[in-house]
Structures are given as structure tokens and as C-alpha cells.
Swiss-Prot record:
<dbReference type="InterPro" id="IPR012337">
    <property type="entry name" value="RNaseH-like_sf"/>
</dbReference>
<dbReference type="GO" id="GO:0003887">
    <property type="term" value="F:DNA-directed DNA polymerase activity"/>
</dbReference>
<dbReference type="GO" id="GO:0039693">
    <property type="term" value="P:viral DNA genome replication"/>
</dbReference>
<dbReference type="InterPro" id="IPR001098">
    <property type="entry name" value="DNA-dir_DNA_pol_A_palm_dom"/>
</dbReference>
<dbReference type="InterPro" id="IPR002562">
    <property type="entry name" value="3'-5'_exonuclease_dom"/>
</dbReference>
<dbReference type="GO" id="GO:0003677">
    <property type="term" value="F:DNA binding"/>
</dbReference>
<keyword id="KW-1194">Viral DNA replication</keyword>
<keyword id="KW-0239">DNA-directed DNA polymerase</keyword>
<dbReference type="Pfam" id="PF00476">
    <property type="entry name" value="DNA_pol_A"/>
</dbReference>
<dbReference type="InterPro" id="IPR002298">
    <property type="entry name" value="DNA_polymerase_A"/>
</dbReference>
<dbReference type="GO" id="GO:0008408">
    <property type="term" value="F:3'-5' exonuclease activity"/>
</dbReference>
<comment type="function">
    <text>DNA polymerase that preferentially incorporates the non-canonical base aminoadenine/dZTP instead of adenine into the synthesized DNA. 29 times as efficient in using dZTP instead of dATP as a substrate. In addition to this preference for dZTP, the phage also encodes a dATP triphosphohydrolase that removes dATP and its precursor dADP from the nucleotide pool of the host.</text>
</comment>
<keyword id="KW-0235">DNA replication</keyword>
<keyword id="KW-0548">Nucleotidyltransferase</keyword>
<dbReference type="Pfam" id="PF01612">
    <property type="entry name" value="DNA_pol_A_exo1"/>
</dbReference>
<dbReference type="InterPro" id="IPR036397">
    <property type="entry name" value="RNaseH_sf"/>
</dbReference>
<dbReference type="InterPro" id="IPR043502">
    <property type="entry name" value="DNA/RNA_pol_sf"/>
</dbReference>
């Protein structure tokens, strides 16, 4: 058989069919479809056609550009099978789709082809597979039989995928041009190969430590529930249950508002009953509410995270155990678009590392010791200092704050605002206005009602009819409104920035981050969030730029070291203990802090290397 000269084409589409999804375990590719710009497609069963396998092994990595939907999966699966693609030359239509519109409900190839190109994949194949193997004619049931199907049937299915991905990529080229998304797309494209490498190499774990930590969580959970029962005077099931309603005994006041026993107003469910969900519990001052939330968090950490995500996905490689997290650059194709973020932040699944709270020292101290650097190396940890608040200051451009940072780049944003407004930096008691909480409200567009709730100040709940549904909204009392107006008066530029962003969002339908990412407001909804989403989106963009700079420095200057992970505003690296680690950490610090395009300085410090993730977060700083 004659194989195509793929080096002559500016781009091709490649898609593999596999025995399953777990490339990091035993699943492998069994077939590959290649689509050319000429419109020709060919499917190769590489189990039977070993000439095709060896040709791909020798030639696919030479392709100028390879495009596909969720091509990261193909890279991993083909590599596990013995065929290497060059991630630097690969482009993912799923990542591009989320840049073009971050609000879609689905990002799978079939949904995008129907939406943009009026094309449809061959879903009849599931009926054909059901006729051969039995069972329901659905993708979920039949996709597991694909590797057993006749070659011509698989070829029909696979070739439609590569053709569809190629044509979607072509359409996206024009749309990226039309929307002027080149800058942010180049950032995502540059980042892609580093994400692939971080996933491929994974993170080393200690399974024995994981089991010990799960047992410790059993003990702490039991103590928490015992204290809850003591305060309640009866046994309370911390999961949603009738005992929680009995505990908080909600009643309607004269205005018809449901209130808990501590006086906290409660929103209503669709049926008009009082809602005692997590948000209601977070609003309460009742200590039992905090114990319920703590017990739930401990159970989730133990059962879902440690036993499910970590131990459930750990694999042994030689004498070590690893997890290989799935890192979502934007939105995923899982069907509901729930993985990844519209503002550009990374998210992790399998395990969901971002769910380990960075500020909850109790949970962090239990979970983070499970994660280890590469064998023979140590773990160093860097955390950006008030990153989103500094970006908030850059955009709002308040004269006093800009001048304060110019005099001392290490100043605390919350203390600066406290000095300007006369409020304490942090709350010293419930119901006390404080600079930190108001800054959080401004960055995350809480609204005055939610801000009042967070600070423990008076608020009411009003039902608002949106036409298709009725929604309960928190309405701040006069005390909170006065505090917010005082904030606007003393921290000048914030109110004007919010007004300007909202106006642009309403008139244009989107706002742009520093790197050109579009944050859209379909039908003009939620434009009051525009300024905060600019801050968060810009932070996400700069975070991705930092990942690229850190990974490329380590790759160039000390390739035996590597970037392990990035969650929240943290960067973790694995380093040789060779006497040069402090030099490398200071270089990384300089790369992250060099942001001349911002009006305010960016600050990060890296820890002295330590044996595990938790100890690195507790170690002295190496870059001060």
C-alpha cells in the first residue's frame, strides 16, 4: 500500500480509535484515520497492518500541523501505542471552540458540527454495532465494542470524525480572524504542549500515606459529627436530611420570609419551602451550620478525592505510583461543559486537584502530604501574592493604591484599602465590615446583598419574577449600602471601572481580557459581573503565560527539573537537590514578576525544596 507524503500538506487531521479511555493504564489505539486537504481519508487498522503502524511511527511526528477534536487524547493514546505526534504542531478544535463561544452547553464534535456546519456524524454505527453485539444502540453501550467491529464499519465511523474535525478547524480559522482572537489563541496553542507533558508524566503519590490520611479523616469526621450532635441535642445526619430541618427549625416571619433559628433569612425552593442548602448554611451564624459544612467537606475529601480520585486512578510505574490528572485548558467535551472555566483558568479532573482548598490548612495538611516530587528530587512551591487583587488595582487604577505599590511593591492590598477607608483589614467579630471582604466582593461582583450576607450584616430576601422563573435575591440593608458607597468614595476608580465594563458588555456583548480573551454576555444577561470577569480572566491569562515561561525555562536550563502542577495561583516544581535549585527558583520568580504591561507589581516567592507538597507550603521562602 502506498502511504501519503504528509509533509507536503500544511495541515492534516488525525484521529485514533482505541480500546478505551485510560491511556495511562492498559488501553491502546487500534486504528488511525488520516484526512488530507485534498478531501481524501484513509483508515488503518494498525493491529493488522504493521506496515501502516511502522509508517506512522516514522512519519506522523514530521507533519507540519495535525488538527483534531480533543487531540490531546490522541497524542497520549498514540504515544502509549508507540506512535509519537509532536504536541507543538497539534491544534485542538475543542480548545478553539471554547475561545469562540464559552457558553455552549456541549463541546463534543457532533454538537459543534451540527451547530456551525450543519453536519452530522454517523450515529447509525451504534445501531449497526448493536445488531452485531447486542445491547442498546447508544454510544455509551456500543463504543466499547468498536475495537471488535469489522474494519470497514470502524473506517466509516473514523473517517467521518477526521473529516468533521478538519472542516471545523477550517471554519474556526475564519471565526478566529473575524473575532480577533489571534493573541489568546496563540497563548493557548503555546500552552498546549506543556499541558500534554504535565499529564503524561503525572504526579508521584504515596498510596500508603493516602490510606493513612483517609483513616485520619474518618477520625476527624467522627469528632466533628459528635460535636454537632452535642450542640444539637440529638443525632444529626450532616447530609441533606430531615434532621437538618429539625435542627434549624425555619419559620416564616411577618413579611412571609423564611428564617432559620438564628434569624438568617432563607431563600425558597421552587415549591415555596425554605432552602437549607449549602449557600444557606454558609450564611448562618449558627455554629451547627459550620459543623455540618465541615463534616460534608471531610467526607467528600476522604471518599471522593482520596479514595476515589487519587487511589482510584493511581497506577504503578516501576517502584513508584503516579496519578495522571486530566487538565482542562478551557471547556471539556464531557457533554455538559462543566469542566474547565470560561475565564481561562485551568481545571483538573482525575483527581480534581483544585478542590483541595488552599486556605483550609486542616484539609491541606491531610491531603497534600500524599503528593511527592519525582524520585530523588524535592518539591518547591510558589504562590502569587494577591494576584487578582493586584490586577483589580491595575484596571481600576486608583491613584492612592498605585502610588502605595510604587513605594512598596510588597504591600498588602487589603491593608491599603483598610487605611484608606478606616475599616479593619479583616473582621474581628461577626457583623463587622472589613476591607478584605469588600475587596473580595468587588473582584467577584458579589452584589451588595451577598456582601452583606458574607459580612454578617442585615439583609432581606426578595422574590424577583424573571418571566420564565422566580428567583430569590438578597437585598442589602442601609448599613451595607453606606459601607459600599464609602468604599467607592475612598478607593476611586473602582465604581467607574465597573460602570464602564458594564456599559461595554451591554453595548458590544462582550469584554476583553489583557490577552484578548472574550468574555461574553448572551442576551445582555449578567453584565453587572463584567468588571470582575475581566479581572479574573486576565488573571487566568497571565497564569497560563506563567506556566509557559516556567516550563520553558526548566526545559531549556535544567531539563531534569519540571513543572508539576498549577492550581489556584500556585506553581509547584520538582527540583534536583544539586546546589543550583535556589538559582533556578530566583530565575522563575523573575519570569513571573516581569509584567511591565501592568500598573502594579506582581509578587511571588518560592519555598525551599521539601519532601512533599504540604511540607513545601510550610517551608521557609527561598527567594525572599
Amino acid at each position: 500500500m502506498a502511504f501519503p507524503n504528509i509533509e507536503q500538506y500544511p495541515q492534516i487531521s488525525v484521529d485514533c480509535e482505541s480500546t478505551g479511555l485510560e491511556w495511562y493504564k492498559e488501553d491502546r489505539a487500534f486504528g488511525v484515520s488520516i484526512y488530507l486537504p485534498t478531501g481524501d481519508a484513509e483508515y488503518y487498522d494498525i493491529r493488522k497492518d504493521r506496515n501502516a503502524f511502522h509508517w506512522m511511527k516514522d512519519n506522523l511526528w514530521k507533519a507540519k500541523k495535525i488538527v483534531n477534536h480533543n487531540i490531546k487524547f490522541d497524542i497520549h493514546m498514540l504515544r502509549a501505542t508507540g506512535i509519537n505526534l509532536n504536541p507543538a504542531n497539534c491544534e485542538c478544535t475543542m480548545i478553539r471552540a471554547a475561545l469562540i463561544d464559552e457558553h455552549l452547553l456541549k463541546y463534543d464534535l457532533d454538537s459543534l458540527l451540527k451547530k456551525y456546519l450543519k453536519m452530522s456524524k454517523d450515529n447509525d454505527i451504534y445501531a449497526d454495532l448493536a445488531q452485531i453485539f447486542g445491547g442498546q444502540p447508544t454510544r455509551k453501550v456500543q463504543i466499547l465494542n468498536l475495537h471488535r467491529a469489522p474494519v470497514d464499519l470502524v473506517a466509516r465511523y473514523a473517517n467521518i470524525d477526521t473529516e468533521g474535525a478538519y472542516k471545523l478547524w477550517e471554519w474556526q480559522e475564519g471565526e478566529i480572524e473575524r473575532q480577533d482572537l489571534h493573541q489568546v489563541w496563540q497563548l493557548e496553542r503555546r500552552l498546549f504542549r506543556h499541558i500534554v507533558e504535565m499529564e503524561r508524566r503525572g504526579i508521584r503519590i504515596d498510596p500508603n500515606e493516602a490510606n493513612r490520611r483517609a483513616e485520619e479523616l474518618d477520625r476527624v469526621t467522627a469528632e466533628t459529627v459528635a460535636e454537632l450532635n452535642r450542640l444539637a441535642g440529638f443525632e444529626v445526619n450532616p447530609n441533606p436530611s430531615g434532621s437538618i430541618k429539625k435542627l434549624f427549625n425555619p419559620k416564616q416571619n411577618e413579611a412571609g420570609i423564611w428564617v432559620a433559628r438564628d434569624g438568617t433569612p432563607l431563600p425558597k425552593t421552587d415549591s415555596g419551602a425554605p432552602s437549607l442548602g449549602a449557600k444557606s448554611l454558609e450564611s448562618m451564624t449558627d455554629p451547627c451550620a459550620k459543623l455540618i459544612l465541615k463534616a460534608r467537606k471531610l467526607n467528600k475529601t476522604k471518599d471522593t478525592f482520596i479514595r476515589g480520585h487519587v487511589l482510584g486512578h493511581a497506577i504503578q510505574n516501576g517502584q513508584d505510583w503516579f496519578v495522571h490528572p486530566n487538565i482542562n485548558q478551557t471547556k471539556s467535551d464531557t457533554g455538559d461543559g462543566s469542566e474547565g472555566t470560561g475565564t481561562g483558568r485551568l481545571s483538573y479532573t482525575r483527581p480534581a486537584l483544585q478542590q483541595i482548598p488552599s486556605r483550609d490548612k486542616e484539609i491541606a495538611s491531610i491531603v497534600r502530604p500524599i503528593f511527592l516530587p519525582d524520585r530523588g528530587q524535592k518539591w518547591s512551591y510558589g504562590d502569587l501574592d494577591q494576584h487578582e487583587f493586584r490586577i483589580f488595582a491595575h484596571y481600576a487604577n486608583p491613584k492612592d493604591i498605585i502610588e502605595a505599590y510604587a513605594q512598596n511593591p510588597d504591600l498588602d492590598m487589603h491593608q491599603i484599602v483598610a487605611d484608606l477607608t478606616g475599616m479593619p483589614r479583616s473582621a474581628t467579630k461577626a457583623g463587622e465590615a472589613n476591607a478584605k471582604q469588600i475587596n473580595l466582593g468587588m473582584v467577584f461582583n458579589m452584589g451588595a446583598g451577598e456582601l452583606a450576607s458574607q459580612m454578617g450584616l442585615p439583609f432581606t430576601i426578595e422574590s424577583v419574577d424573571f418571566g420564565d422563573h422566580v428567583h430569590d435575591l438578597k437585598k442589602a440593608g442601609p448599613e451595607t449600602l453606606e459601607i459600599v458607597e464609602n468604599y467607592y468614595a475612598k478607593v476611586q476608580g473602582v465604581k467607574e471601572m465597573a460602570r464602564k465594563a458594564r456599559t461595554i458588555a451591554k453595548s458590544r456583548g462582550y469584554v476583553r481580557t489583557l490577552m484578548g480573551r472574550h468574555i461574553r454576555f448572551p442576551r445582555g444577561m449578567f453584565t453587572y459581573k463584567a468588571s470582575g470577569l475581566i479581572f479574573q480572566g486576565t488573571a487566568g491569562d497571565l497564569n497560563k503565560l506563567n506556566i509557559c515561561n516556567i516550563a520553558e525555562y526548566l526545559e531549556s536550563e535544567c531539563p531534569y527539573n519540571r513543572l508539576l502542577l498549577n492550581i489556584h495561583d500556585e506553581y509547584s516544581v520538582s527540583l534536583e537537590d544539586d546546589g543550583k535549585e535556589i538559582k533556578h527558583l530566583k530565575e522563575l520568580q523573575g519570569l513571573v514578576q516581569h509584567r511591565p504591561e501592568l500598573r502594579v507589581p506582581i509578587r511571588i516567592d518560592f519555598s525551599h525544596p521539601a519532601p512533599n507538597w504540604w511540607l513545601a507550603t510550610r517551608a521557609d521562602l527561598a527567594t525572599k
